[in-house]
Amino acid sequence: MNIPYVDLAEQHAPIKEKLLEAVSKVLDHGKFVSGEEVAEFERRFAKLCGVQYAVALNSGTDALILALKALGVGSGDEVITVSNSFVSSTSCIVCAGAKPIFVDVGEDYLMDPALIEKAITPRTKAILPVHWTGRPCDMAAIMAIAKKHKLAVIEDCAQAVCAEYRGQ
């Protein structure tokens, strides 16, 4: 017996015609990266997130790399994260030229804020918590630690888009 993990055909059946129409439109005008659909997505996603701007990139990996580089993270720096995530949460740190420092997770499988301060060194530049399975990390505790030590925080939300934390 074969039981599919996720039946994507069934899941998308109700909107199949709309999906085909949208894909056909993009294929016809050929603007895969900078077309009006991307601009519309950015506008709507920014509104959904309650921010002024959103920038669509080719991957979450590149988004994290750009965020780290924009903050000046590079060679000789350390970034605290967790190891129980997709490879991007670590590879982005390496691609930025820094060293990932792992802290363990709590019973909720999310970054354990109680372990962060023990991992901080003079080379620590940022904390990269990974929100996972639709659940956000304890951001109040993480932000308090970051503020105390003057560290940047880059949140990997790829697995928890639109997740709420304390009503936000």
Mark where each language-model region is:
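Active-site His/Glu-centered metal-binding helix of metallohydrolases
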Residues: F45, C157-A158
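N-terminal "arm"/small-domain region of PLP-dependent enzymes with the aminotransferase-like
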Residues: M1-K31, E36
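Generic alpha-helical secondary structure signal
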Residues: P14, K18-A22, E36, E40, ...
